[in-house]
């Protein structure tokens, strides 16, 4: 009896020490695929956007003088990501944009939120591998929810930073995004 117990312990340990078979999951980086012409165009557009953003954010990080929120590096980053993603979604380029971000992303892909739920979060994750942008994990989540909340209100990119500052704290915006709430004035504008 004792021998059987020892034997089963050994086989369990051996089974645990074996490498697991590769399982394809949606949150893991996809296997390299051959891009379609639309995806190649989107990837070139994304690379150009990423490079321009890194240069501009780097320029805005120079100097220690106080700036209004609109002119800070973080304000510029939010505004440009918002502008780019809204433009691509309005042109119905969501599928190729998602593929492009998956290709640009280093590491695991998020399970939540999905690209459909929050494309801004995914775009910020795609930019995370750029050291010039210095994006932290908490900022990605917070900025993604702020941009999604602004998109629900159809805020023009130029007014984005002001809208975020006027609507309240990040905690309040998080709650409103989770509850699918809108600002009280939104329904009165005929939207």
Per-range role (PLM):
Residues 58-167:
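Short, Lys/Arg-enriched phosphate-binding patches
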Residues 169, 173-191:
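Intrinsically disordered, low-complexity, charge-dense segments enriched in Lys/Arg
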Residues 1-74:
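N-terminal intrinsically disordered, low-complexity, charged/polar
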Residues 11-12, 72, 167, 171, ...:
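Residue-identity detector for threonine
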């Amino acid at each position: 009896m004792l021998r059987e117990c020892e034997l089963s312990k050994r086989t369990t340990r051996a089974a645990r020490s074996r490498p697991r078979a590769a399982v394809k999951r949606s949150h893991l980086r996809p296997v390299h695929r051959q891009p379609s012409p639309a995806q190649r165009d989107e990837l070139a557009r994304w690379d150009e956007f990423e490079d321009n953003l890194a240069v501009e954010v780097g320029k805005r990080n120079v100097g220690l003088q106080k700036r209004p929120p609109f002119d800070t590096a973080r304000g510029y980053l939010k505004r440009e990501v918002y502008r780019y993603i809204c433009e691509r979604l309005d042109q119905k380029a969501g599928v190729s944009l998602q593929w492009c971000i998956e290709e640009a992303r280093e590491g695991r892909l998020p399970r939540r939120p999905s690209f459909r739920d929050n494309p801004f979060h995914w775009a910020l994750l795609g930019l995370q591998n750029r050291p010039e942008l210095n994006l932290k994990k908490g900022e990605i989540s917070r900025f993604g929810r702020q941009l999604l909340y602004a998109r629900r209100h159809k805020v023009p990119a130029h007014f984005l930073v002001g809208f975020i500052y006027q609507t309240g704290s990040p905690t309040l915006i998080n709650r409103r995004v989770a509850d699918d709430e809108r600002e009280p004035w939104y329904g009165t504008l005929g939207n």
